[in-house]
């Protein structure tokens, strides 16, 4: 009950706040930006890693998430690759939402990943024979 009161007090005091969506002056600014990341062995008991993603549209934050991966990754490259795949799925869904809201936007996405091995794996998955097991996990 105390947590509910705390939330209601917070909402009452922040009714004047909101998200600012500036007008796009450039078609390159009018894209959906996404960041994804995965931790390094955060859960030592279950061995599942936590991944996060964050989205901006017109330079304003619109969505974020942090949750445990559903599978056990064998390496940091695999964990980052899975996080990027989950982020891409969310991005496709957000583009459908923007279409449903009749927002005029350029269909482009910028996905930022901080692991060079995962980026190389995403660019050329055919040359990586040791990554076939990832497809069956997703």
Outline where the language-model segments fall.
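Divalent metal-binding acidic/histidine catalytic loops
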Residues: 1-138
């Amino acid at each position: 009950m105390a947590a509910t009161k705390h939330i209601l007090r917070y909402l009452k005091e922040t009714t004047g706040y909101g998200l600012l969506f500036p007008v796009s002056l450039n078609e390159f600014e009018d894209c959906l930006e996404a960041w994804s990341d995965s931790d390094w062995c955060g859960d030592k008991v279950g061995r599942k890693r936590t991944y996060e993603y964050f989205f901006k549209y017109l330079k304003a934050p619109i969505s974020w998430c942090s949750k445990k991966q559903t599978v056990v990754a064998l390496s940091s490259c695999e964990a980052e690759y899975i996080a990027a795949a989950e982020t891409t799925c969310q991005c496709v869904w957000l583009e459908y939402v923007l279409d449903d809201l009749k927002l005029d936007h350029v269909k482009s996405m910028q996905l930022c990943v901080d692991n060079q091995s995962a980026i190389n794996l995403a660019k050329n998955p055919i040359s990586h024979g040791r990554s076939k097991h990832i497809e069956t996990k997703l």
